[in-house]
């Protein structure tokens, strides 16, 4: 059913203004952002498609379907959104902007009160920071002696190897922040979080180098859309 065919008090925008945002379903809130549908597909249907469970095309191996709810959508990139029919460049840009604001708000809250004392806390924070990036990034969380966040820096971009990530630079940044410990992190835009041999070798190199200045490596987290892996939990540290 098109929005115009709904009773006035049931249309998402009017419902939000009259009753508050908490009364709206996720699809209704998205419909307000999207504003209009396309021929043969109403805006509510388009919004629901974004929230539908994801799938995989058996022939191509490419992702299909939606993003599995708001949490999954939070990590979607502009390129990911292209698979939803009817989402043109303008709608994709608006949606990505809103999602980025949401990620920044969540990350700020975590940063202001964060004590990274469990792998889950670290993974959650890093997913907000790295999962939606379309290129590979190597980042470091610099922590004090109580595992509180001092800073996060993206130090290198591109395919990560022992030759593209410079241990000296990581050490200099750790000393600059007076860090007692670090968490290493990088993303795999391809979607796999399994560590490669290069990931393991790089981790050991950085761990040995940072130990020379009494900085502990607590973990190396690999992030992909919708998932994250802790190398510490896997016993690879």
Curated annotation (Swiss-Prot):
Residues at which Zn(2+) binds: 186, 188, 199
Source organism (scientific name): Verminephrobacter eiseniae (strain EF01-2)
Coiled-coil ranges per UniProt: none
Gene3D superfamilies assigned: Cytidine Deaminase, domain 2
Keyword flag Transmembrane: no
MPN domain boundaries: 115-237
UniProt keyword annotations, A-Z: Hydrolase, Metal-binding, Metalloprotease, Protease, Zinc
InterPro entries: MPN, RadC_JAB, RuvA_2-like, UPF0758, UPF0758_CS, UPF0758_N
Keyword check for Disulfide bond: no
Highest taxon listed in the record's lineage: Bacteria
Gene Ontology molecular function, alphabetical: metal ion binding; metallopeptidase activity
Protein name: UPF0758 protein Veis_1654
Annotated GO biological process: proteolysis
Motif placement: JAMM motif: 186-199
Segments crossing the lipid bilayer: none
Protein family (similarity comment): Belongs to the UPF0758 family.
């Amino acid at each position: 059913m098109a929005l115009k065919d709904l009773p006035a008090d049931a249309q998402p925008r009017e419902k939000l203004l009259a009753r508050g945002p908490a009364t709206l379903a996720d699809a209704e809130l998205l419909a307000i952002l999207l504003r209009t549908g396309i021929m043969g597909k109403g805006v509510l249907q388009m919004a629901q498609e974004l929230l539908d469970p994801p799938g995989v095309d058996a022939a191509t191996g490419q992702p299909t379907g939606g993003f599995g709810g708001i949490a999954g959508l939070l990590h979607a990139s502009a390129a990911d959104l292209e698979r939803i029919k009817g989402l043109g460049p303008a709608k994709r840009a608006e949606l990505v902007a809103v999602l980025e604001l949401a990620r920044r708000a969540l990350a700020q809250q975590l940063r202001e009160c964060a004590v990274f004392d469990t792998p889950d806390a670290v993974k959650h924070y890093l997913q907000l920071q790295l999962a939606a990036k379309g290129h590979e990034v190597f980042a470091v969380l610099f922590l004090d002696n109580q595992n509180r966040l001092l800073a996060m820096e993206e130090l290198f971009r591109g395919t990560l190897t022992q030759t593209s990530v410079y241990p000296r630079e990581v050490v200099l940044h750790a000393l600059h922040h007076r860090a007692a410990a670090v968490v290493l992190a990088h993303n795999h835009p391809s979607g796999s979080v399994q560590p490669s041999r290069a990931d393991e070798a790089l981790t050991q190199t950085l761990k040995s180098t940072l130990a020379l200045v009494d900085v502990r490596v607590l973990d190396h987290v690999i992030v992909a859309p919708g998932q994250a892996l802790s190398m510490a939990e896997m016993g690879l540290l």
